[in-house]
Every structure is written in structure tokens, then in C-alpha cells.
From Swiss-Prot:
Pfam family, one: RimK
Biological processes, Gene Ontology terms: protein modification process; SOS response; translation
Binding site for Mn(2+) 2: E260, N262
Cofactor(s), by name: Mg(2+); Mn(2+)
GO CC, one annotated term: cytoplasm
Family: Belongs to the RimK family.
Entry protein name: Probable alpha-L-glutamate ligase
HAMAP family (alphabetical): RimK
Gene this chain is encoded by: rimK
Organism listed in the record: Picosynechococcus sp. (strain ATCC 27264 / PCC 7002 / PR-6)
Cofactor, how bound (note): Binds 2 magnesium or manganese ions per subunit.
Amino acids binding Mn(2+) 1: D248, E260
SUPFAM superfamilies: Glutathione synthetase ATP-binding domain-like (SSF56059)
């Protein structure tokens, strides 16, 4: 197959591993900085230009699009879909997953377990907002935050009020969630490919840190999932329309709860922790689902 990896940095671990896995299986692979592409969107024969050359006849696309590049990145993915390329994640699913509020609303509608969550912008009834999720302690998040940035644990009602007031001064949209104390600062990253969890790890926050992000000094270990946890991760990815996803779960007293779904999950932490060839699993999935030579429009509006 002819595969395009859409990535701004070919030296990133995830990009390198995907390229290596594809080449090991004898595919023709090209890493493309999607931010440097331009497109003809009105042509009867739509195309993408990169480094002065038309990008044509790709059987499969692997988007590795960071949060800050979502708008243009998904536009490029959409153009490849119009040209008939099979994307590991569709442009629509990526856009949907990048909106944290919309993601939670979709998951709630599908009956998937979530922490009790409130959403606000400039409410004057801060006390009511806090009580809506069961009172302190609560976790307060900036809607646009990533990698644990803009996430605060408020252990008392007064602390929660102070944080919400401060965020309100930033003219920010905020999520307020119940704090799952029994999780003890750990979460579980489930890596879903297709309709299967191919690898999973438990992440523990650094000393005195309730956020478990590896970017923030957390550590990771292999973990055995329960059937309910596997089912929840797969159902969550499917609800979002994601074929490749990192689903973050908390273990609560009333079952697994979904914290977040990532449409461009990193491979380094999960591969080094579990020893699973996750990049290879993604390429295998493309082999089974991307029909070489298919040129019909795959776009979903």
C-alpha cells in the first residue's frame, strides 16, 4: 500500500515507529508535514500539493495531528478523504474528539460511565455549580487544556470557588468534575485499534500530584484490564467514531469511568511500558480496511 503519515515532525517517536512498522511490512511510506500542504478544493479532480508535488493515489492516511493544529490538520485529512484515501481516523472523528464538552455529551448520551460533570462560562452561581457535581473536592479544568495543563484539584468548597472565579476572569470555559478519590491519582490508558484494546497501562501521578500524565513526571506499569474496562474503552472509541484512540479510564467504586479520549495518542509510553508493537497493530488494521486503488470519495459530512 501507499501510506501517508501526516506529522509535523518526522523525528518524533510515534512518527518514526509508524514509518518503521509500515516499511517492515513492505509498504511505500511518506511522512508529510500537513501544515505545509496546500489544496485545490474546488477542482473536479481535487488534489493536495506538498513541496511542489501533487500528493496522489494514497491508499491510507495516518493523521498525527496535535491539538494546536486541529483546524488545518483536519482540513488536510478531509481533502485526502475526498480523494479516496482511507484515514486511520476520519477528519470528523478527530474534530469531534478535540471538543472535550462535545465528547462528554456524546459519551453520556451513549450511556458510558463518566465522572459527574458540570460546565460553565461566566455563571454567578458558583456555589450551585459546585453542588451540582456533589460538592468538594472537585477537579476543575479549562476546556481547552491538554497534557494536564489547566487542571486543578480543589479540596474544599472555598478553594473551588477561588479557582472558578480566577478562571472566570480569564473568560474561559470550564468543566467541574467530581473527584474520584478511590482512583488514588492513577488512571488507565487503553489503546484501541479497530474494535479491540491492543495494549493498556496504568499511570501513577508523581509524588503529591493527582494528575497522572507522563508529561508531568508520572510513571507507568502494565495492567490487566477487566472485561468491563475493555468493553468501556471500545464502546467509548466507537461512540466518538475513532478507529485509533487512547481512552483514559478511572477505576471507581461504581465501575470504570472515562476521563478523556485522544485521537492522536502517543506510542512511546504504551510501547515501552507494555512491549506491544502498537505501531504494527495500526498498520495491520490499515491493511485489512484500506482497499488499495479505491478512489471514491470517503468524506463524511
Amino acid at each position: 500500500m501507499k501510506i501517508a503519515i501526516l506529522s509535523q515532525d518526522p523525528k518524533l517517536y510515534s512518527t518514526r515507529r509508524l514509518r518503521e512498522a509500515a516499511e517492515n511490512r513492505h509498504h511505500d511510506v511518506q511522512v508529510i508535514n500537513f501544515m505545509r500542504c496546500y489544496m485545490n478544493i474546488t477542482s473536479h479532480q481535487p488534489f493536495v500539493i506538498y513541496q511542489g508535488q501533487r500528493l496522489e493515489n494514497f491508499d491510507a492516511i495516518i493523521p498525527r495531528i496535535g491539538a494546536s493544529a486541529t483546524f488545518y490538520g483536519t482540513a488536510v485529512v478531509r481533502q485526502f478523504e475526498v480523494m479516496g484515501g482511507f484515514s486511520a481516523n476520519t477528519s470528523q472523528a478527530i474534530s469531534r474528539s478535540r471538543d472535550k464538552l462535545r465528547s462528554l455529551q456524546i459519551l453520556a448520551r451513549k450511556g458510558i460511565g463518566l465522572p459527574v460533570t458540570g460546565f460553565a462560562h461566566a455563571t454567578q452561581d458558583i456555589d450551585g455549580l459546585i453542588e451540582t457535581v456533589g460538592g468538594a473536592p472537585v477537579v476543575i479544568k479549562l476546556l481547552e487544556g491538554t497534557q494536564g495543563i489547566g487542571v486543578v484539584l480543589a479540596e474544599t468548597h472555598q478553594a473551588a470557588k477561588s479557582v472558578i472565579e480566577a478562571f472566570r476572569g480569564l473568560d474561559a470555559n470550564i468543566l467541574v468534575q467530581e473527584y474520584i478519590a478511590e482512583a488514588k491519582g492513577t488512571d488507565i490508558r487503553c489503546f484501541v485499534v479497530g474494535e479491540k484494546v491492543v495494549a493498556a497501562m496504568k499511570r501513577q501521578g508523581a509524588e503529591g500530584e493527582f494528575r497522572s500524565n507522563l508529561h508531568r513526571g508520572g510513571k507507568a506499569d502494565k495492567v490487566r484490564l477487566t472485561p468491563e474496562e475493555r468493553s468501556t474503552a471500545v464502546r467509548a472509541a466507537k461512540a466518538m467514531g475513532l478507529r485509533v484512540a487512547g481512552v483514559d479510564l478511572l477505576r471507581s467504586n461504581h465501575g470504570p469511568l472515562v476521563m478523556e479520549i485522544n485521537s492522536s495518542p502517543g506510542l512511546e509510553g504504551i510501547e515501552k511500558t507494555t512491549g506491544v508493537d502498537v505501531a504494527g497493530k495500526i498498520i495491520e488494521y490499515l491493511e485489512k480496511n484500506a482497499a488499495p486503488g479505491k478512489t471514491t470519495d470517503r468524506i463524511q459530512y
